[in-house]
Curated annotation (Swiss-Prot):
Top-level taxon of the source organism: Eukaryota
GO CC terms: chloroplast; chloroplast stroma; nucleus; plastid
Annotated tissue distribution: Expressed in roots, stems, leaves, flowers and developing siliques.
Gene name tied to this protein: ATJ11
Pfam families named in the record: DnaJ
InterPro entries: Diphthamide-biosynth_chaperone, DnaJ_domain, J_dom_sf
Annotated localization: Plastid, Chloroplast stroma
Name of the protein described by the UniProt record: Chaperone protein dnaJ 11, chloroplastic
Length: 161
C-alpha cells in the first residue's frame, strides 16, 4: 500500500546528498604495446596460351540459336552438323581443354554444344525447334475484323468488373 508519509532513501544512488569520495581507478604501471603486423603480396601474370584463342567467340556470349552454337547455317545437313560438333568438341571438351581454363566454364560450353548437337542431329527435334524459331522470328499480325483478329488477353479484358 502507498502511504502519504515522507520516505527517506538510504541507498547512495537514490539519495540527494553527494557521495563521500570519488573512487579513482587503480593505476597501471605496465604498458601494453600493439603487436607488429606485416603483410606481403605477390602477383604473377602469364600470357594466355594460343589454345584459348581457338574457342569460338560466339560461345562467350549468349547465342541466338542452336545453329549459332554449332556455327552452322540454318539449312545445314546432318553431316555438316556432325562435323561441326566434332570440331568444337576437340576444342571445348573438358578433358581436352586443359588446365589453362577453368573446368566449369569448359564443361558449360561443351554442354551447350552437346545440347545443340542432340537437338539438331535428331530430325524430329530439329523440326520442332525450327518451327519454334520460325514462330519467334515472325511478328504477330493483327487483322482489322473477324475472328482472326483476336490477339489474346490484355489488362482491360483480364479485369473482373
Amino acid at each position: 500500500m502507498l502511504s502519504s508519509s515522507p520516505t527517506s532513501f538510504t541507498h547512495p544512488f537514490l539519495s540527494s546528498s553527494p557521495p563521500l569520495s570519488p573512487i579513482s581507478p587503480p593505476s597501471r604501471t605496465a604498458r601494453i604495446s600493439p603487436p607488429l603486423v606485416s603483410a606481403s603480396c605477390s602477383y604473377t601474370y602469364t600470357e594466355d596460351s594460343p589454345r584459348l584463342h581457338q574457342i569460338p567467340r560466339r560461345l562467350t556470349t549468349v547465342p541466338a540459336s542452336l545453329y549459332d552454337v554449332l556455327e552452322v547455317p540454318l539449312g545445314a545437313t546432318s553431316q555438316d552438323i556432325k562435323s561441326a560438333y566434332r570440331r568444337l568438341a576437340r576444342i571445348c571438351h573438358p578433358d581436352v581443354a586443359g588446365t589453362d581454363r577453368t573446368s566449369s566454364s569448359s564443361a558449360d560450353e561443351f554442354m551447350k554444344i552437346h545440347a545443340a548437337y542432340c537437338t539438331l542431329s535428331d530430325p524430329e527435334k530439329r523440326s520442332v525447334y525450327d518451327r519454334r524459331m520460325l514462330r519467334r522470328s515472325r511478328p504477330l499480325t493483327v487483322g482489322t475484323s473477324g475472328l482472326g483478329s483476336y490477339v489474346g488477353r490484355n489488362w482491360e479484358t483480364d479485369q473482373c468488373w
